[in-house]
Amino acid sequence: MSTLRLLISDSYDPWFNLAVEECIFRQMPATQRVLFLWRNADTVVIGRAQNPWKECNTRRMEEDNVRLARRSSGGGAVFHDLGNTCFTFMAGKPEYDKTISTSIVLNALNALGVSAEASGRNDLVVKTAEGDRKVSGSAYRETKDRGFHHGTLLLNADLSRLANYLNPDKKKLAAKGITSVRSRVTNLTELLPGITHEQVCEAITEAFFAHYGERVEAEIISPDKTPDLPNFAETFARQSSWEWNFGQAPAFSHLLDERFTWGGVELHFDVEKGHITRAQVFTDSLNPAPLEALAGRLQGCLYRADMLQQECEALLVDFPEQEKELRELSTWIAGAVR
């Protein structure tokens, strides 16, 4: 029986693909070597320890229907579209070795006619007239008996959109999460015009087979066909949940301030696990009572725009004469935390 397993995803759903990856990793035999090839439609993927409000322009993501997905490995934030090819190599220990998977990807690129080299701990770069440019970034995860190396190759990604979603609003966030390091990048189409996802997948697959000296049939997976993936429904539910993608952010503080016609407002939030643990409100409004009441209501509230808006509007019952002010406040807060 072959020790290799090759899976190719037909889905562009990042939550589906990351859930598949997690399930395979958890249940694979320690003797198995796995290659999983996939890609995501418009998504910002953040590292396990990152703060999405610090890393991403969450408001613009929501406006443009760009998903957020938190992966189980460390590292920084990246933007995925269908111009990226994603790969995951898995193996049991002691065989797991990220230098092997890196060499497989380099051999695949070489077979396609691209001379690339490893740079630092996580990147593959090519030489261009403008200097070295990154074409691949990676992240890793290890447990006591297995490990995986996953990464992306930039084929024909819309690089202008990287800045749209990975440059956050100038929020006053004093956060403890890991900050992404920005790198100069280029697409493989600059070197190989017309290169496709299918060609890259085939090259990586052939390099994978060549390294291990055996071949297997590919398993094509999709939301309608998830072979041999125990507990997939539960894993997908977690991967797609707000609690995982947003709520797992490291503790941080957020300061918001705005001046309205009726007075200035300053809000201080401490947030842990996606919940407000402390809310302070400062104002020079002539009627501070509704704002003081809001501070109490926000304690324990989910740090989500719709939930904050709901708490603001709930105050209309007790302070109907301040309806105009409360609606202005509600709209502002909801926009500020998206």
From Swiss-Prot:
In the transfer reaction, the free carboxyl group of lipoic acid is attached via an amide linkage to the epsilon-amino group of a specific lysine residue of lipoyl domains of lipoate-dependent enzymes. It is found in: Cytoplasm. Keywords: ATP-binding, Cytoplasm, Ligase, Nucleotide-binding. The gene is lplA. GO terms for biological process: protein modification process. Catalyzes both the ATP-dependent activation of exogenously supplied lipoate to lipoyl-AMP and the transfer of the activated lipoyl onto the lipoyl domains of lipoate-dependent enzymes. Coiled coil: none annotated. (R)-lipoate binds at K134. Its EC number is 6.3.1.20. ATP binds at R71, G76, A77, V78, F79, K134. Pathway: Protein modification; protein lipoylation via exogenous pathway; protein N(6)-(lipoyl)lysine from lipoate: step 1/2; Protein modification; protein lipoylation via exogenous pathway; protein N(6)-(lipoyl)lysine from lipoate: step 2/2. Its main location: cytoplasm. GO terms for cellular component: cytosol. Belongs to the LplA family. Residues 29-216 form the BPL/LPL catalytic domain. GO terms for molecular function: ATP binding; lipoate-protein ligase activity; lipoyltransferase activity. The lineage of its organism: Bacteria, Pseudomonadati, Pseudomonadota, Gammaproteobacteria, Enterobacterales. This is Lipoate-protein ligase A. InterPro entries: aa-tRNA-synth_II/BPL/LPL, BPL_LPL_catalytic, Lipoate_ligase_A, Lipoate_protein_ligase_C, LipoylTrfase_LipoateP_Ligase. It catalyses: L-lysyl-[lipoyl-carrier protein] + (R)-lipoate + ATP = N(6)-[(R)-lipoyl]-L-lysyl-[lipoyl-carrier protein] + AMP + diphosphate + H(+).
